[in-house]
């Protein structure tokens, strides 16, 4: 008895075979005009500064509307997003009004340089807590949002300032962000960059690797 291998190609369809919300989520940068591979889930960075240019003046609707305007070939895709305060080599993501209140911005030269805010300043923590609550009120029940990454703290919102470890947030501030995000997004799957410390004790928290499969946390290709 002989068998013959057959290849069955399944066309795109709305149904169980889609394996929804699984696979690769492509990055989107301002200099791109289209994706080079077909995707059905996008990843977006956005700064706190863009979303709250003035105290409690939230630009969530405007930002969400821009998803399809800037990316017409991915219209209605599911999305994953992360809010950052500090993206090395880019302008600060901390709102100017918060800087004007006196929150210290500490310069560094690693990864192209930037300004790392004092994550433990009570003014920043209070404003960030209020922002997270508003962010959840807007996005928690929107089905287009597949996952939300914790973000906010550290370089790229990745929860580290290596090798400038003295710039990172205290354990208390880390706990505040995790707890507030969980409370604000009860209907979304949240993701963290690592399982270090308080991030590693929650069964409801998932993890993401930005550079997989280019490299891993251990540096192997």
Describe these PLM feature segments.
Residues 51-52, 87-94, 154-160, 198-201:
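Short catalytic/ligand-binding loop motif for oxyanion handling, primarily in non-cytosolic enzymes
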Residues 56-67, 125-134, 168-180:
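Well-ordered, non-membrane alpha-helical segments in soluble/globular domains
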Residues 2-123:
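N-terminal substrate-binding region of glycoside hydrolase catalytic domains
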Residues 106-124, 131-167:
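Active-site groove signature of glycoside hydrolases
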Residues 6-30, 40, 147-154, 163-221:
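Catalytic-core regions of glycoside hydrolase
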Residues 69-77, 131-145, 176-190:
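A structural motif corresponding to the C-terminal end of an alpha-helix
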Residues 55-60, 161-164, 197:
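Generic preference for flexible, low-structure residues
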């Amino acid at each position: 008895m002989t068998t013959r291998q057959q290849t069955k190609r399944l066309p795109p369809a709305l149904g169980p075979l889609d394996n929804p919300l699984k696979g690769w989520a492509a990055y989107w940068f301002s200099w791109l005009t289209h994706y080079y591979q077909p995707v059905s889930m996008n990843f977006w960075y956005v700064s706190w500064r863009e979303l709250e240019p003035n105290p409690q003046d939230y630009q969530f609707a405007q930002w969400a509307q821009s998803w399809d305007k800037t990316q017409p070939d991915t219209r209605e895709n599911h999305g994953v997003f992360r809010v950052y305060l500090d993206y090395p080599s880019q302008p600060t993501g901390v709102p100017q009004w918060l800087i004007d209140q006196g929150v210290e911005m500490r310069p560094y030269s690693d990864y192209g340089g930037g300004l790392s805010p004092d994550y433990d300043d009570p003014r920043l923590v209070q404003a960030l807590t209020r922002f997270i609550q508003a962010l959840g009120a807007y996005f928690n029940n929107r089905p287009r949002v597949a996952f939300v990454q914790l973000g906010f703290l550290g370089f790229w919102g990745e929860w580290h300032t290596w090798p400038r470890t003295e710039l990172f947030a205290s354990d208390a501030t880390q706990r505040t962000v995790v707890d507030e995000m969980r409370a604000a997004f009860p209907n979304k799957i949240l993701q963290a960059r690592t399982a270090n410390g308080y991030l590693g004790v929650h069964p409801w928290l998932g993890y993401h690797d930005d550079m997989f499969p280019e490299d891993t946390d251990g540096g192997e290709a």
